[in-house]
């Protein structure tokens, strides 16, 4: 090609529309060079709806969470009005709180995560069934002491709600998400990156260990108080704390240090089992709130150290249960995001840092300085 023809080509290139220039450059590229095949529909810069969104599942999650919260609130109130007769109702109400939190979290983030919380739903259903058996045993031993009224209705309603949640989570599958996964991950993987929440889990584990040690020490102190000798509920509660807190804290720390598929699954299982137990214990000890409120009704208030200690232990239990529920939600969110984006992460090795001289190769093509400079010169000449 002569020099005159070359100039004509450059002038012709300059007169093209801006969008046509990019198309012509893309057509002139070498066959060995890599260009990302991106379409306007693949660019998901603003995601208003989560992937695999289903309105039916979202409505079910929000409705089930609302029903569980309302029923648990009424059950806690009625159980505190009759603290000694309806202790089973407080336990059942407390155990359903993690399921309500998880239902709202699933409806807000990703509805395809419902099957991953099946262990939590099953453990909550087991606790509510135990409370129903507890009610039956109390009714057999002393029929005249229990009024079968609103308490039985609330207990059966909690049982039915948890049974429906377990059935729906068992029947839910992630096949629709897997079918849609190709269209989601082909064009948007370069925009999003799945990262494991290691710092969050480490902070959770530290707080869990501190709160667990404080709760165990407080339990030992409370058991040595004269007023606590009459009831065995404190010893059972503190054994639950001792068993439930430390395995989840250790598993959180180990998983944050060296994340793998096996450890994430184990952490989800442990958190799903311990969270309903911790909230059950906190629901049982919720009568301490009414005792502390009654203390300040009289003036001057007759403060009892035993009631204040029970209230502090209740707050520690709520903190532990909230951290365990948050751990389960974080791990399930990471698991679902990694599965949707087809992220490959080695289940056997810990994350390693890149060498100092290694450069990360991106999918974008190299910038052609010579062609850009010639285009600028021609534009200025015109």
UniProtKB/Swiss-Prot annotation:
Q: Per its UniProt record, what InterPro entries does this chain match?
A: Membrane_MLC1
Where, per the database record, does this protein carry Phosphoserine? 183, 185, 188
State the annotated membrane topology for this chain.
Multi-pass membrane protein
Q: Does the keyword Membrane apply?
A: yes
Signal peptide interval: none
Give me the ranges of the annotated region Disordered. Answer: 1-43
Q: Which domain of life is it from?
A: Eukaryota
Q: Where does this protein have compositionally biased stretches of type Basic and acidic residues?
A: 1-28
Alphabetically, which GO biological process terms does the record hold?
caveolin-mediated endocytosis; cellular response to cholesterol; positive regulation of intracellular transport; protein transport; regulation of response to osmotic stress
Q: Which residues cross the membrane?
A: 58-78, 88-107, 117-137, 148-168, 205-225, 234-254, 263-283, 309-329
Q: Which GO terms describe its molecular function?
A: identical protein binding; protein-containing complex binding
Disulfide feature: none
Reported function = Transmembrane protein mainly expressed in brain astrocytes that may play a role in transport across the blood-brain and brain-cerebrospinal fluid barriers. Regulates the response of astrocytes to hypo-osmosis by promoting calcium influx. May function as regulatory protein of membrane protein complexes such as ion channels.
Assembly: Interacts with ATP1B1. Part of a complex containing ATP1B1, TRPV4, AQP4 and HEPACAM.
* Stated name of the protein: Membrane protein MLC1
Q: Which organism is it from?
A: Mus musculus
